[in-house]
Amino acid sequence: SRSAKSLPLCQDLPFEILAQKMFAGMNSSSLLAIPFFILAGNIMSRSITGKLIGISNAFIGWIKGSLALVTVVASALFGAISGSGVATVSAVGGTTIPAMKEEKYPAHFAAAIASMASILGPIIPPSITLIVYGSITGVSVSKLFLGSVIPGVLLALVLAGYALFYGKKHDLPAHKRRSPKEIACTVKDGIWALLMPVIILGGIFGGIFSPTESAAVAVIYALLISFFVYKDMSFKDLGSVLIDSSIST
């Protein structure tokens, strides 16, 4: 187009240099973390979402409106794995919204709390949004992750507080309180899922590996526990996960 042809003339740059500059803008190792975190999130959404929800429900299911609170907690945990709001609302909201509607929660509230909780994904590290921002501005992605921890936790607490308030005000249903033995069994079953955000964030903040390396570790860990621990994913499922991740990326 004419605008494309006039761009190098306006900047007194030859086309070769312009092409190099365009490539240099995308030539960042930090950006490699994005497809890896998306892939890890998609793998885990097929495997561990139910585990995270089950653990959350085991501890707080006895509170009125507990499913809304479980949605917030599970979204925070899943956000610490995928770094994506879309993946979070798809994985967690896709499970908890139908469950809330089945227990006669107002449909608008169920959709709203799941949507709001999903924004924890782009805030709580490893946030894909922060990876892109750091790549563009040259700011350390690890420092961005560290700076987003407190805002993410505060937002999760605000959402949890509102879920508690709404549940008590509207007398929403609660589940039976679990015994310590039942809670221990649920945690034991889902402990591998809980370890994933610990490995990712602990490795980054502990200086063990970079955000990009942590994303690769997350994919390997997700594959290992999905295929060999929980055994709830097949190679056929992996193919569809790879396609979905490519589209999302």
Model-derived regions: residue spans:
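Alpha-helical transmembrane segments of multi-pass membrane transport proteins
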Residues: 1-249
